[in-house]
Every structure is written in structure tokens, then in C-alpha cells.
Amino acid sequence: MTRIVIIGGGPGGYEAALVGAQLGAEVTVVDCDGLGGASVLTDCVPSKTLIATAEVMTTFDSSYEELGIIVADDTPHIEQAARVVGVDLGKVNRRVKRLALAQSHDITASVTRAGARVMRGRGRLDGLQAADGSRKVVVTAADGTEETLTADAVLIATGGHPREIPDALPDGERILNWTQVYDLDELPEELIVVGSGVTGAEFAGAYQALGSRVTLVSSRDRVLPGEDPDAAAVLEDVFRRRGMNVMARSRAQAAKRVDDRVEVTLSDGRVITGSHCLMAVGAIPNSAGMGLEEAGVRLKESGHIWTDKVSRTSAPGVYAAGDVTGIFALASVAAMQGRIAMYHFLGDAVAPLNLKTVSSNVFTDPEIATVGYTQADVDAGAIDARVVKLPLLRNPRAKMQGIRDGFVKILCRPGTGIVVGGCVVAPRASELIHPISIAVDNNLTVEQIANAFTVYPSLSGSIAEVARQLHTRKRAGEA
């Protein structure tokens, strides 16, 4: 029986374990924290659970008056009025941890039910490949005891951890990274969020919705520099309109506690203060101390593991998946990398990883979902595409729900009308992007999308309307 050892129990690891076991291999998963990895225990699942509460708060705050809702105490609408609803952050965070642990237990049950073995500990490669093609993996348990496993193939799926600034080290109380925020029992009165990427933007929006006064420190010209510029502009406008202090072109250099306050020093000498500070300045791959280079595994300068499109590393019999590869920090991509690795090694049919069909979402309010080629690709000349953007303000369902911010954007080939990308900014954009994802994955045309029935009224009607406009322009261009 083929022996496979998987180091790391996140989406890349546990999905690979399920596939490997189903294909008849003897699979061992080595994990030190609990299956699900950071995605389930400290990152994706916890943050989206927190955001679920924030979403309810935002929806109510922004639309209850327009929709004719009167609160029980008949609170009048005055400038700087007290909020009519509040949040118990301790209760929210207890729910966050409870759901994360439940999800981890469910994953463990699925993996063991499939026939895989789960070992608690840290794994490292022991030297080069043996003459028979096998490899040794040393597992160190929490008590220091070691066990050596023999594997025909090894998958590295160890994820990453929060990057730290030397002069702004988290203390777990006032200066926090994103794994520590769920230990808070009280809502931060004034939260400084350092970093305006996906993690920073999500937490800044969530805590503002929960009731904190938020300052977002961005070293770039705008929030979410890696996202569609139109989408980022909408979100930044929403943030500012709701009272967030967004500081663009401001790089944090240091953060320190002063009694019960935090002082953040910017690179230009300015100092801002708050009750708490959240550092969201990227992640570092968990690739150190694993004997990777000694085993022939090539690392990039960033510490990420180099892989090809079927998850192979430079070392025979060693594969890698997930955040440790630095390819695309998404649970869905990690899971696909892990599955591809197993299919490839075990001789099953496999399609190489295609990042142009990956859909992603920023869980702010509104959400920002994208798939395929982007506006930046078009602007840079990477692809010739027609682009139509339709504001949600014109959508009847959006009007009924009091939705003012957002749009649907679709990109298609000029000649054929084949859909090559899209961006949706809306509540639940993560759900609305799916039909565009299907179109990108299956080379569907804007005509096919336009001809499909949509419910009236619905936000998805805007997707069909954008497709109709693109199809009309295509026909006009052919005339």
C-alpha cells in the first residue's frame, strides 16, 4: 500500500488526506493544533463568524429608518445619537471559538472516517530521498518524544503565521495580531488597524460595525491595493462615510503601550493613539525548521516553497499546498492544490492548477468578489477585453433593500463575447459571483448569460443586465 504523510492539517492537508484515503493510500496527517489549520481555528472561520455579527449591526444601522422600522424606545434620529443596538463582544467571541472548534472536530471525524491516521505533533523531513524512493518524516510530539515515519510521498501544508514589525510586537492585550482578537471580552473603544490589505480591511470594517472608533493605517494610496480599483474606491468611500479615519500613504513604524493606551508612530514622525492596535501586515510561511532545503526542497527568498502546477516541489516525492507555497492565500486554492497533489502522485487523472478560474471574496460590507481577469489586467494590456460596469443603484431589489453602494462588472472577449472575468461589489457578493465563475470556467458567452432567466426582482438581475449590454455592444461592433 502506498504510504503518504501529510504535514499540516489545514485545507490543503485535510482535503489531500480525504482524496489519498479514498484512492486507497495509507495516509497519516501530522498536525500540531487541530485539523482545519489556521483557516478554521484562527483565520477564515473565526473572522467570518465575527463578521456575521458585524453584518447584522451594519444592515440594521444603515437601513432601519429608511425601511420604516421603529425601535422599542422610540429613539429619535439626532446627530451623534446613541446606537439603538449594542454588542456583547465576549459572547460573540465565545461563539466564534465554539464554531471553530466544532468545525475542526467535524473535519477530524471526516478524515478518520475516510481511513486516515491523525497524529498530534510537528513534522520535519529527515534527509534526502532513499534509494527505494521513500522519505523519512520525524514527528515530534508536545512532550518531546519522536517517531519516525516512512513515506512514499510527503505533502507539506503547514500554512503561515502573522508577520510582525520588530518595534510593534503584539502583547496579546492591547497590541494584537489577528489570531489574538478573539480573546477580547470588551469591545475596543478606539481601534487602530495597521495594514489595509484584505485582513486589515475586513477587521476594520467589522469593528467599526460593532461600535469601535476605527483608524485604518494604509501605507498605500488606497485600501485594498490588490483589488479592483473601482471596488476599493467604493469600500473606502463607505468606510469614510461611516466615520472611519482612513490614513492613506501612512506607514506604521512602531507601536507601544502607554498605560491603558497604545501609541503608533508613523514613518513621518506623526503619532496616533488608541485603546487597542491590530497589526495586519501580512503573513510569513511556516517553512523554517522542517529540514526542507536539506531534503532538496527549493525555497523562494520569501521562505515560500516553490511548486509547479501539479503541486510538486523541486524534491522528488515531496509536494506542497496552501499558504506555505505563496501562490494564492485562499482556502479553496489550498484545498485544490492538496487534491491535485494526491491525484498526481497516485496516478489519477488531474488537471493542473488554473488560477484564472479562482473566485475570491473580501468579506467587508459591501463584499468584494472577483474571478478571472481583472480591470488591472485590461489596463496593463495583459488581455484585450470589453468591460461594462453597472451600479446597483439601478437595481430594483437593491432599492427595496436600501442598498446604495456597489456594482456588477463583467469582462468579455471583444470578438467572441466569452466571459473572462468579473467583479461584484454588493451584500453577499460571495454568492453573486458564482454565475460569473461558472461562465469563466466553462467559456460561456455574455449572450448565454443574458439569455438565462433571472428572478425579478433580484440582485442577480444586474448580472444579466451587464451581459446584455456587453452583447449589444458586441453586435454593434460587428455591424
Tell me what each language-model feature is.
Residues 1-12, 187-197:
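Beta1/beta-strand and adjacent pyrophosphate-binding region of the FAD-binding site
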Residues 2, 18-25, 30-187, 215, ...:
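Glycine-rich flavin
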Residues 5-12, 16-33, 38, 45, ...:
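Flexible, glycine-rich terminal cap/loop adjacent to redox cofactors
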Residues 5-7, 123, 148-159, 193-194, ...:
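Short hydrophobic core segments
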Residues 44, 156-213, 217, 246, ...:
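Glycine-rich dinucleotide-binding loop and its adjacent helix/turn
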Residues 117-119, 176, 245-247, 386-388:
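General small-molecule cofactor/ligand-binding pocket signal
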Residues 172-188, 271-347:
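FAD-site-proximal beta/loop scaffold in flavoenzymes
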